[in-house]
């Protein structure tokens, strides 16, 4: 069949023209109603319909009868238009935290330039400028996401749960979790540490005579509050800090009797002999971190989102394969000693994939704070989790495919992303 009179192109021609993967084209056909024509086993794309669909923001195309009447026909982008597009520079700001060990993958991505590398591979004709925004806590980055000053952010489980609630209060802010980062099981990764002279071994031994330090509005402060609530320790003085390094300094200098610390400061305190870990059942849940973006931004910058997740997965792979090389990068970026970094890296599960166990952890965390109930049956059940970006990133790296649903049951080590 001659294609030219009908303005048809093959599916592969459309893929080459748009510069996307086959998985993206298939998803657009399914979810965004990309216009196509199936003749026998072959899939064809009408050039005019495709152009109208792209110009319409990837929504429904103009009805076929209007196209046939010639009422709204636009030519495909010319060489001049493509040249103009390369002159437009798109700025992307990534928020990261050097003082949170479970989020150290971002330091590797930044140091190695892997995000920029993946962007060049995905869209060689586009110009991007990547900026990096350092923060001392995840809630700072959530505020930056809401303001539109940060597009991709690495945050802990409390900011993840809090952002879901903020999304309900602020209709224009629809947070999407793109992938997990570091994970720690069963209360590891974040704990209460008391000075040895305090003689405190259990949470119920806390008294009002000594203050406790932690980072305000954080995964650490939420867990500390749970310990205090369980033991009815309303009289205990809590000193809120903006930086976890300040909490460790207060503990070392004797200005507080205890501090709720996350890694690497937990291991650092133990290495320096600053105190003893306090046993507290309230800290027994998993400690999780992840990558977030605004859903509308991610949807309109799909190739950028997938590019970052590819770099993110590569950082995880480097940590697992060559922890010394990863630790050296982190030392240079954070100033934390190598002897602290290495054991911390080994204690963390570096896995971007989503398990039902993880969704249950976040659901419980949200219920504790605000009555938030995250749906855990399907990643596509609500705006909180978007599986397609991580799926495409894994496929591009030739890793085993990820399901649309959360991986059931417990963590396994046979597939790590």
Give the residues covered by each predicted segment.
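N-terminal hydrophobic or amphipathic helices and topogenic motifs
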Residues: 1-142, 146-147, 356-417
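Bilobed "Venus flytrap"/periplasmic-binding protein-like clamshell domains
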Residues: 91-118, 191-258, 263-268, 360-363
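Short helices/loops that flank or line small-molecule/ion binding pockets
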Residues: 136-153, 166, 241-260
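Acidic, polar ligand-binding/catalytic clefts
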Residues: 152-200, 249, 412, 416
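A ligand-binding cleft/hinge motif common to bilobed small-molecule-binding domains
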Residues: 154-170, 255-275, 360-371
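Pocket-lining segment of extracytoplasmic ligand-binding domains
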Residues: 159, 243-333
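Secondary-structure end/capping motifs
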Residues: 302-381
């Amino acid at each position: 069949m001659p294609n030219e009179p009908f303005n048809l192109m093959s599916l592969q021609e459309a893929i080459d023209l748009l510069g996307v993967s086959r998985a993206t084209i298939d998803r657009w056909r399914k979810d965004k109603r990309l216009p196509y024509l199936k003749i026998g086993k072959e899939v064809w794309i009408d050039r005019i319909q495709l152009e109208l669909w792209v110009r319409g923001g990837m929504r429904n195309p103009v009805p076929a009868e209007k196209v046939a009447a010639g009422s709204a026909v636009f030519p495909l982008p010319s060489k001049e238009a493509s040249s103009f597009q390369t002159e437009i520079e798109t700025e992307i700001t990534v928020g990261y935290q050097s003082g949170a060990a479970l989020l150290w993958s971002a330091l590797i991505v930044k140091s190695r330039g892997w995000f920029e590398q993946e962007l060049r591979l995905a869209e060689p004709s586009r110009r991007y400028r990547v900026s990096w925004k350092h923060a001392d806590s995840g809630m700072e980055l959530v505020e930056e996401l809401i303001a539109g000053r940060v597009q991709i952010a690495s945050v802990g489980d409390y900011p993840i749960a809090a952002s879901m609630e903020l999304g309900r209060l602020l209709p224009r802010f629809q947070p999407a979790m793109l992938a997990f980062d570091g994970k720690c099981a069963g209360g590891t990764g974040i704990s209460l540490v008391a000075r040895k002279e305090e003689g405190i071994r259990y949470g119920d031994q806390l008294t009002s005579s000594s203050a406790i330090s932690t980072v305000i509005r954080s995964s650490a402060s939420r867990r500390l509050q749970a310990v205090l609530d369980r033991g009815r320790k309303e009289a205990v003085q809590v000193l809120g800090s903006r930086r976890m390094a300040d909490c460790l300094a207060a503990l070392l200098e004797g200005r507080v009797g205890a501090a709720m610390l996350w890694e690497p400061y937990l291991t650092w305190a133990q290495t320096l002999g600053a105190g003893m870990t306090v046993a507290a059942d309230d800290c027994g849940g998993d400690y999780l971190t992840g990558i977030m973006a605004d859903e509308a931004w991610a949807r309109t910058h799909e190739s950028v989102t997938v590019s970052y997740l590819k770099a993110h997965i590569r950082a995880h792979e480097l940590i697992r394969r060559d922890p010394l090389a990863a630790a050296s990068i982190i030392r240079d970026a954070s100033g934390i000693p190598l002897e602290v970094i290495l054991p911390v890296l080994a204690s963390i599960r570096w896995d971007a994939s989503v398990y039902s166990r993880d969704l249950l952890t976040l659901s419980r965390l949200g219920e504790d704070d605000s009555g938030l109930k995250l749906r855990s049956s399907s990643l596509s059940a609500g705006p909180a989790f978007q599986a397609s970006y991580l799926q495409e990133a894994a496929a591009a790296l030739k890793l085993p495919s990820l399901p649309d649903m959360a991986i059931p049951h417990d963590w396994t080590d046979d597939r790590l992303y």
